[in-house]
Amino acid sequence: MKNLIIPNDYHSKLDLHDTQIAIKTVKDFFQNQLAQHLHLTRVSAPLFVDPKSGLNDNLNGVERPVAFDIKEQDGRIAEVVQSLAQWKRYALKKYGFSYGEGIYTDMNAIRRDEDTDNIHSIFVDQWDWEKVIKLEERNLDTLRSVVRNVYRCLKNTEKFMSIQYDYIEEILPDDIYFVTTEELAQIFPDNTPKEREYYIAKAKGAACIMKIGDKLENGKPHDGRSPDYDDWQLNCDIVVYYPVLDIGLELSSMGIRVDKDALLSQLDKAGCPERAELPYQKSIIDGELPFTIGGGIGQSRICMFFLRKAHIGEVQSSLWPEEMVSECAGHQIQLL
């Protein structure tokens, strides 16, 4: 398959049984680190929401959410969440969280339009987190500070796993490198955005790529972002170099959330100003929700990275094209 990478001479250092134990080890340690360093409280989260609420993540604006009707409620439609980006900010207010406090949760989603490969699945599992900040903290200094805390959690987890498993060596650099999408475009003008991410990740080991969603000087955005959660001038992806596949691997997407001005501007740029009338978006415009920063951290990608797996299907159960399943089996890649 054209999207499948088969590493030379790959074989997993862990069998299926030990992989399951290792997955739990990674997840337990990392989420405890995240809660500790970002001062987060674990909460329960919805699997589905009312599409009329505006709480579902619109992602890049083209992905179709999974929806179903509810018999008892006269055929009312519910949508399976694509992420909890909007819901978390709403929950911080509803649950009464104050400045400096935050929440995290397990988020499970179905992305039916995903093109699957070694790192993409139609099943998405991530830690979604959000915390309250002040208006004056809506700046890049705040973003960088939180990114460093998240990166510290990643570094601590890698060190912990290297102690638990002899075959795992520490490969993350001591510090993460910060760069904007425009700076990347200037450094690598002849490359695609994904190629730029690969080159900077391979050169630096770990990169925080900032300002994603708006058009660059070349007239094209680095990548798509929903207009109604991240402020496109105050967001980022954490991308690390992954030698098993020789790729830049995105582990986290995060950002300072939109205020009224950023929301209205981005809705207009995205060609969907009518979304300003949805309940969630209207609550931002009316100043009813707290200022926040938040993000998502891929659980399966974290496990894949720290366990040095070749395919995300080695650490999560999903459905894959038959050709992919067959080719993986022929190269000692055991999909769950």
Question: Where do the PLM segments sit?
Answer:
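Extended, charged alpha-beta segments that form solvent-exposed binding/catalytic grooves
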Residues: 105-191, 195
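A translation/RNA-centric and nucleic-acid-associated enzymatic feature enriched
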Residues: 110, 180-336
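Class II aminoacyl-tRNA synthetase-like tRNA-binding/catalytic domains
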Residues: 2-120, 128-132
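A glycine-rich phosphate-binding loop feature that marks nucleotide/adenosyl-phosphate handling sites
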Residues: 47-51, 166-172, 321-325
